[in-house]
Amino acid sequence: MRHLLSTADLSRADALAVLDTAEEMAAVNQREVKKLPALRGRTVVNLFLEDSTRTRISFEAAAKRLSADVINFSAKGSSVSKGESLKDTVQTLEAIGADAIVMRHWSSGAARQLADSGWVRSAVVNAGDGTHEHPTQALLDAFTLRRRLAAATGEDLVGQDLTGMRVVIVGDILHSRVARSNVWLLSTLGAQVTLAAPPTLLPVGVAAWPCQVTYSLDEALDASPDAVMMLRVQAERMGGAFFPSAGEYTRTWGLTDDRFARLTAGRGALLDEPVVMHPGPMNRGLEISPAAADSPRNTALEQVANGVSVRMAVLHLVLNHDQEVRP
């Protein structure tokens, strides 16, 4: 794997290779000394041109646990704020010694443009590009679901996909790169994905995606989902009114206490105890109630922890793809 740009690029075998490698990395993360020499002498640049907490810190931790040198770059205080182009920025970073560029960018398609441009020889990892994709978030979500499934079935994790799992993704699909990446990846791994959102928050062309669409969250909850993934409303990307009010959105599309109680009282298609997922940050009281956010059924912090292992796997595979992992 030379780059990681989109989950749509990943075959089932590719996705399982990342998840299986991440399991080996997770074993390292349980040690007292959480280090591997896999990327010693390599330089990873975190080029974040949009704000981030979880993803940036997770990639930094992942690279350092693989013994890489890490350079963190943000637009604020750099020449980007003076109008420097992406081409000049990345060529400067490669001249400094970047072997991999982990990039978050406000423009959809920016990561693929960089990888295909010939501007640099560095590996490119998409850490989120506009409303397009966020592949490592989808991979860590799949990793989390696979672990839950293995715990429920007692089966070996290695080589296991998500066949038969039912996952509902709820909320602002229109502006969500997480939703797009999850639809492609989860369907590739055999899961049944349903999008639940008002028509105003669904993108044009969604009917062609490998998923089902419903305009009723309550109907989606009645279909015995194994996981319900709540998405925040991305008000910063909205130029107009996409729903009447915050209160109306919560009543219709929020995981309220009543809906959460219904979810936890039932069983999923494969999991006896369905889970709530959230990529963060959570807007408590809007898309998710405080009780649901704080429940042990909420895997948000589990997802964050798993993200380090998954990103270790991704960095290893794009930079050392011809070598075996040795935990």
From Swiss-Prot:
Keywords: Pyrimidine biosynthesis, Transferase. Its EC number is 2.1.3.2. L-aspartate binds at K82, R177, R232. GO terms for molecular function: amino acid binding; aspartate carbamoyltransferase activity. GO terms for cellular component: cytosol. It catalyses: carbamoyl phosphate + L-aspartate = N-carbamoyl-L-aspartate + phosphate + H(+). The keyword Transferase applies. Heterododecamer (2C3:3R2) of six catalytic PyrB chains organized as two trimers (C3), and six regulatory PyrI chains organized as three dimers (R2). This is Aspartate carbamoyltransferase catalytic subunit. It comes from Micrococcus luteus (strain ATCC 4698 / DSM 20030 / JCM 1464 / CCM 169 / CCUG 5858 / IAM 1056 / NBRC 3333 / NCIMB 9278 / NCTC 2665 / VKM Ac-2230).
